[in-house]
Swiss-Prot record:
Top-level taxon of the source organism: Eukaryota
PANTHER family: APOLIPOPROTEIN C-I
Localization of this protein: Secreted
GO annotation (BP), single: very-low-density lipoprotein particle clearance
Keyword terms: Lipid transport, Secreted, Signal, Transport, VLDL
Annotated S-S bridges: none
Species of origin: Pteropus alecto (Black flying fox)
Signal peptide: 1-26
UniProt protein name: Apolipoprotein C-I
């Protein structure tokens, strides 16, 4: 049974070996590489901008930032009241 199953596998491997190596891809020339750089930089910049905006929005919407902002507001009002009552 194993011998019968291994024959098709052997035939496929033999066909792949006899096919030979795949043709090599042509190396891109320098001019085409240099022409693609601005597009890649623009794509990179937009990706970074999108991730940065997402991170900033996430920070703004987080509970920690809201609590911190409230704490600073309360502290400022307390200091302001103390300053007004003292002077």
């Amino acid at each position: 049974m194993r011998f019968i199953l291994s024959l098709p596998v052997l035939a496929v491997v033999l066909a792949m070996v006899l096919e030979g190596p795949a043709p090599a891809q042509a190396d891109p020339d320098i001019s085409s590489s240099l022409e693609s750089i601005p597009g890649k930089l623009k794509e990179f910049g937009s990706t970074v901008e999108e991730k940065f905006r997402t991170a900033i929005d996430q920070i703004k919407k987080s509970e920690f930032s809201e609590k911190t902002q409230n704490w600073f507001s309360e502290l400022f009002h307390k200091v302001k009241e103390k300053f007004e009552t003292t002077f």
